[in-house]
Every structure is written in structure tokens, then in C-alpha cells.
Regions:
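Alpha-helical membrane segments and immediately flanking helix-loop junctions
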Residues: 130-189, 204, 322-408
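N-terminal alpha-helical transmembrane segments of multi-pass membrane transport
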Residues: 1-93, 256-259, 263, 272-284, ...
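Hydrophobic core segments of alpha-helical transmembrane domains in multi-pass membrane transport
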Residues: 10-21, 35-47, 100-109, 177, ...
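Intrinsically disordered, low-complexity non-transmembrane regions of multi-pass membrane transporters
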Residues: 1, 61-62, 72-81, 217-265
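Structural signature of hydrophobic alpha-helical transmembrane segments
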Residues: 1-11, 95, 295-299, 356-368
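Transmembrane helical segments that form the transport core of multi-pass membrane transport proteins
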Residues: 263-346
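Hydrophobic alpha-helical hairpins/lids featuring a short glycine-rich hinge
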Residues: 69-133
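Juxtamembrane and boundary regions of transmembrane helices in multi-pass small-molecule transporters
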Residues: 161, 185-243, 380, 385, ...
Length: 415
């Protein structure tokens, strides 16, 4: 029964994407099927194939070890306050948010040295060749395995002005459906296994292509609609270019790149901290008001998103929990949801815990729309109106990317 419900969930999700589609007749069914099949293969290799699981665990250990070096800088600056084992216990602002500064600096260095760009170009080129997506959008989709929603477009900033609306939609969906490497240790610090996060990140490019190319597929030229012809012309122009990934940005040298990365990390940590203070306090206020009626915001969200929890094929006792977490992620943010999931994992099965974690991977929430519009339009002001027009569907698409990845992994485990 679990397998049937899980499979039904994938079918219903694809049906929902079809209903959301702006150009139903132009959906490239061959592309969608190919991307889905490859996503299933990747999921199988990571969660069922013995060598794949061993490799994933090794990579997870390496990533965790590398990212943990941020504790050295935090220990120097904050002393025992940076040690979770000290009498002061866990101090989220220091031990979780503080580590973002180191990771952001590391990403800045890898980005400047061209290491991230090289990986993106290899994997993105392979995906583009197999699926027929343009080089630009393939690179951006893959870049979101490592970079955030406003960071990945930097790689191809000079091509943004030539991108079609379908390609812009993929930029939005892959951005909001992904995680940045800079926050991985933050999630891990809340009790989420790095292995779970890496699986979720690996499935982002293919899931983003499936979702975006159903919601807004590339258009077919029509003599009756000049706008469609213009959109197609822009897509062909962007696809025909030899895409050169920009690694240097505005940085003069490696030291400047590291410094810029650290500053970006500080701003990100401050932004996340400010959001958490505001959101947690406001939720407490709302729950205080709702308490008069004997309900809470968490209970409301659990029932609103219950159909998704059911279609994930989870045990009955886990459905409302998963639904409430999904609601918290979409309405509030993923940090709140991961913070709630972490303490629960020990009481969940491997399948339930992994599915819930993957479903929360990604930046898709209400505030992300504004972040994407303002962040990406800095590189391409002429696309601001297009970004604003597509942002809401982009957010829903990013949310559904994580749900689709969760359903795919859940089905692989259940079979």
C-alpha cells in the first residue's frame, strides 16, 4: 500500500504541475520523462545501491569534516561559547549561524579558483546534452547544488538578458528549490544528517528541470503571437552562445574573494538570525491568540498540508508531523522547519526521516520571492518585471521540487 500511495503521489504532483502550466500543449513530454528517469537512477544509486551509499557516506564525512573547521575561528573569537559541549550548551547564533561566515568564505575561494565552475560546467553540460536544455539554464540548475538562489545566477550573469521566460522560470525554481552550501552546516547543527542534505541537493537539478519545464515550457513559434516569436528568438540566441562561466566576479584576487565571501556570510547570518527572531516571536504571538480557541498555527498547517503528507506514503502517525513541517517551511522558512525536525528524527524510521528532511530542503517560502526578484535583477534590471511576474509560480515550483525529490526517494526505498 505504501508503494501505491507513494506512486500515486508522484502522479498527482505531475498532474498538479500540468494544471499550473502556462503552455500545456507545449510541454516536452520526452524531456520530462528523461529527467524523471535520470532522477530515479540518481536516487537509486544514493539510497539503495551499496557502492553508492558507501560513496555518499564518504562524501558526507568529508564535507562534514571540512565544514567543521569553522569551529576553529569561532573558538578563537568566542572561546568556550563556541563549544556545544560546554556548560553554556548550544548557542545557535554562535555555533550555527557563526559557521556560515567560514563556509561562505570557503565557497568564495572555490568559486574564484574555478573549482565550482568546473564541476558545474561538466555536470551541466552532460545534463544539457541528454535532456536538450540550453547550456545556460543547465549550468544554473546544477550550480544550485552548491550556491544559493541569488548566487548561482552570477555564474552566467551576462547571459540573463537573453534568456527566455522558460529559462528564467528554471532559474527561479532551481534557486528556490535548492540549498546553498553556506547553510548546510547550519542545518546539520540542528540535528539533520549531512547524508540526507546531500541527497536532497543532488536531486535539485533534475527535479527543477521537470517542474519548471512543465509549469512554463519553451514555446512553439506562432505567426499569430509576436510575443511568442520574440521569446523563442531570445531562447535560441542564448542557447547558441558558447557559455563562459564567470568565476572572478568583481574580485581582484583570492584574498579579495575570501574577504567578500566572509562579508556575504556575515550578512547572511545576520539576516537569518533577524528573520528567526521575528518569525519565532510572531508565531508565539499568533499561537497565544489562537490559544483562546484551543488551536495553534502548527495544528492549522498540519491539516492544510495533510494531503501531501498522506501522498508521501508515510505511516499514519507521521502524516500530520510531515504536513506541519511542510507548512512551516513554506509559510515561515526552512530553518524553522529543520529546527522542529531535528529533535524528532530519533523517533522516526529511516524512510520517514529522510523523506521529511528532503521535502524541507530548499529556500522556497514567501519571503524568497522578494529575495529572488531583488537579487537577480541586480545583474539584469531589464528582467525585473519578468521576475516579478514569474516569482509566485517560481516559489510554488521550488516547493514542489523538494516534494518531488522526497517522493522519488521514498518510492525507491519502499520498493
Amino acid at each position: 500500500m505504501t508503494i501505491l500511495i507513494n506512486a500515486l503521489g508522484i502522479v498527482i504532483l505531475l498532474g498538479a504541475l500540468y494544471l499550473l502550466s502556462s503552455n500545456k500543449k507545449d510541454i516536452n513530454k520526452k524531456l520530462i520523462i528523461k529527467a524523471l528517469l535520470i532522477q530515479f537512477v540518481v536516487a537509486f544509486l544514493l539510497v539503495k545501491f551499496p557502492l553508492g551509499r558507501i560513496a555518499l557516506q564518504k562524501v558526507s564525512d568529508v564535507v562534514t569534516n571540512v565544514l567543521s573547521y569553522g569551529k576553529e575561528g569561532l573558538g578563537f573569537l568566542f572561546g568556550p561559547l563556541a563549544d556545544a559541549g560546554a556548560p553554556t550548551g548550544m548557542i545557535f547564533a554562535i555555533q550555527v549561524l557563526g559557521n556560515i561566515i567560514f563556509i561562505s568564505a570557503l565557497v568564495g575561494a572555490l568559486y574564484y579558483l574555478g573549482i565550482i565552475g568546473f564541476i558545474v560546467k561538466i555536470i551541466g553540460g552532460a545534463i544539457g546534452s541528454v535532456l536538450g536544455t540550453s547550456k545556460v539554464e543547465s549550468f544554473v540548475a546544477v550550480a544550485n547544488m552548491f550556491l544559493g538562489q541569488t548566487e548561482s545566477p552570477i555564474l552566467v550573469a551576462k547571459y540573463l538578458k537573453d534568456m527566455s521566460q522558460s529559462e528564467i522560470m528554471l532559474v527561479l525554481i532551481s534557486g528556490m528549490g535548492s540549498m546553498s552550501a553556506t547553510v548546510l552546516m547550519g542545518y546539520a547543527g540542528m540535528g539533520i544528517p549531512m547524508e540526507y542534505l546531500l541527497i536532497g541537493g543532488a536531486l535539485v537539478p533534475l527535479g527543477s528541470i521537470v517542474v519548471s519545464k512543465m509549469i512554463l515550457p519553451e514555446v512553439v513559434p506562432s505567426l499569430a503571437d509576436q510575443d511568442l516569436q520574440d521569446d523563442l528568438a531570445q531562447a535560441e540566441a542564448a542557447a547558441s552562445k558558447e557559455v563562459k562561466i564567470d568565476n572572478k566576479g568583481d574580485n581582484a584576487n583570492l584574498i579579495a574573494a575570501i574577504s567578500q565571501g566572509a562579508n556575504d556570510g556575515l550578512n547572511m547570518a545576520l539576516g537569518i538570525g533577524a528573520s528567526l527572531i521575528a518569525i519565532i516571536s510572531l508565531v508565539a504571538l499568533v499561537n497565544g491568540l489562537l490559544g483562546v480557541f484551543g488551536i495553534s498555527l502548527e495544528q492549522i498547517l498540519s491539516y492544510v498540508f495533510a494531503p501531501i503528507g498522506f501522498l508521501m506514503g508515510l505511516p499514519k502517525q507521521d502524516i500530520l508531523t510531515a504536513s506541519q513541517l511542510l507548512g512551516s517551511k513554506l509559510v515561515l522558512n526552512e530553518f524553522i522547519a529543520f529546527g522542529q525536525l531535528g529533535p524528532m528524527l530519533s523517533g522516526l524510521s529511516y524512510r520517514s526521516g529522510l523523506m521529511m528532511a528532503i521535502s524541507l530542503c530548499g529556500f522556497a517560502n514567501i519571503s524568497s520571492m522578494g529575495i529572488c526578484i531583488s537579487g537577480i535583477s541586480v545583474f539584469c534590471p531589464e528582467k525585473r518585471n519578468v521576475l516579478a511576474k514569474l516569482a509566485f509560480k517560481g516559489m510554488l515550483g521550488g516547493f514542489l521540487v523538494s516534494v518531488l525529490s522526497s517522493l522519488v526517494v521514498g518510492l525507491i526505498i519502499a520498493i
